[in-house]
Amino acid sequence: MSKRIKVMSVFGTRPEAIKMAPLVLELQKHPEIESIVCITAQHREMLDSVMDCFGIRADYDLNIMQQGQDLTAITTRVLERMREVLAEVQPDIVLVHGDTTTTFAGALAAFYAKIPVGHVEAGLRTYDRWSPFPEEMHRSLVGRIATLHFAPTANNAHNLEREAVEGDIFVTGNTVIDAMAYTVRGEQFVSDELRQVDFSRRVIAMTCHRRENYGQPMRNIFTAVRRLALNYPDAEIVYPVHLSPVVRSTAEELLGGVPNIRLIAPLDAVDMHRLMARSYMVMTDSGGIQEEAPALGKPVLVLRRETERPEAVTAGTVKLAGTDTEEIYRLAAELLDDPAAYDRMAKAVNPYGDGRACPRIAQAILSHFLGAQPPEPFVPAH
């Protein structure tokens, strides 16, 4: 191939952007690759802050965000806009990340245009199509479409092998560990609200926003957190509340007015990573944070019934707390009361990456198109 390889990276939400940004920067280093960025802006405000943080500009901005749009509307808008962009650019490969609606629609648009797809963060599974919804089905379907599968861990690769997916599978580590090399430098916060937090206290960083937790599960979680705050007045819970009206109204109802719970605006990637780095522990239903916090040596309680990231549970850095009020409270109280239990989780090995996932993915693309040496797989330290 005499011309440069046209690699189009497609993403639309903040978590995707955090994990794709270091890959875009890596692709730009290779003279054999022409890197093109296409954003759908499924999360407009949150996405822009990440792009600014990494100094990345979009070549194409589909700007699909509309008030109150459902999954069908997002999917059809991405498909229609992507058709035009793909016809104009004619990339050699389209890279999508993870399991969002943008991921699925972007991969499907590339498939319809007969363009190969590379799936970053491939092979994560719960094997329950309804949990997480719609992410589990999205990533499974993208697994059928993709030609190159970039699995963060050996376990993810085994899932793909069992499913007999077509194409080549590479164990790369997770790109979020690469991203943290950019974000965790220094301790200064952008957010004024974070500058007011007293980090001499035991700070608990918290997030809760997943669609499958809407309703009673979220009320259970917030009830446990409220009780924890009231019973441990020396601890401070910092909760950047998602922009979703469902999440905001429930958080304000159940967590508002408690002196040691700070409900703050959503954070950019830099502030979120630095908040976790200075916190005592983390409570979250986020997928990415299950990978990020262990890299910082922080125990994580996962506020979900199941996780597609079992490696950290096995390693001991993460515990599945579920959405039962009593169980969440018990596990959080144990970490606040029992130094030995805390140390066991804080000192466990991070199984998700060594900060070299992006170079491995770039090398895999060069290997596929130019016959270069394939990358060595990521193997966690023991």
Question: In which residue ranges do the predicted regions lie?
Answer:
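Nucleotide-activated sugar donor-binding and catalytic core shared by glycosyltransferases
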Residues: 1-239, 244-382
